[in-house]
A protein has these predicted regions:
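Ligand-binding loop in jelly-roll beta-barrel domains
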Residues: 34, 71, 91-117
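Short histidine-centered beta-strand/loop micro-motifs
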Residues: 29-30, 52-57, 98-99
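Short acidic-glycine-tyrosine-enriched beta hairpin
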Residues: 9-10, 76-94
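A short, N-terminal "cap"/entry segment at the start of jelly-roll beta-barrel domains
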Residues: 1-37, 129-171
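Hydrophobic small-molecule pocket/channel-lining residues, especially in calycin-type beta-barrels
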Residues: 49, 70, 78, 85, ...
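A contiguous, mid-protein "functional segment" used to position or interact
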Residues: 102-150
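Short, conserved beta-strand element in jelly-roll/cupin
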Residues: 40-46, 55-74, 109
Length: 171
């Protein structure tokens, strides 16, 4: 690991990347800036965005939900996680998520930050507001995963069509 730098970023600050898996990432603290200790990014996604079942062999992944709701599958157990909720997928544990709210804003922490090269390989700099709704490019996602040691794609998302709606709250 390298030497960490002091980092201060305000809301909206940071490098913005359109991710081939869907959504726009804003890098809040890069692996280079943290001496490789971690990668921290904000992810803005829309309803229906889902990840394939996957695992990170060398990184623990923590996702804090700032706004919105996700249906999360960690090692075969499915749970809904809403605002100010968190889920942790330790390295080597299969997981996936589905956005069930209209939009969601997530804070994603990967420790250590060695997986950043995968995200950069599967992303493009944001050039316009239209990038926020650009459709996923799953072929590019698979290609980037095959070149990376940071992620293993295990299969399709484990969610059914009827799970795409937000949880109903009692009246």
């Amino acid at each position: 690991m390298g030497t960490a730098q002091a980092v201060i970023r305000q809301d909206g600050d940071g490098e913005k990347l359109w991710f081939a898996g869907g959504g726009v990432f804003t890098i809040k603290a890069s692996a280079e800036e943290t001496g490789g200790a971690f990668l921290l990014f904000e992810d803005r996604v829309v309803r229906g965005k889902t990840t394939p079942m996957h695992l990170h062999p060398n990184e623990d992944e923590t996702i804090y939900i700032l706004d919105g709701e996700l249906l999360v599958d960690i090692d075969g157990e499915q749970r809904r996680v809403g605002p100010n909720g968190v889920f942790v997928a330790p390295r080597g544990v299969p997981h996936a998520f589905l956005v069930t709210s209209e939009t969601a804003r997530l804070l994603c922490l990967q420790t250590p930050g060695s997986g950043e090269s995968f995200y950069r390989d599967a992303s493009d700099p944001v050039s316009s507001a239209a990038d926020a709704t650009r459709p996923p490019d799953l072929a590019r996602l698979r290609d980037a995963a095959e070149r990376s040691e940071a992620i293993q794609l295990l299969g399709p998302p484990p969610f059914t069509a009827d799970q795409h709606e937000p949880a109903q709250t009692p009246a």
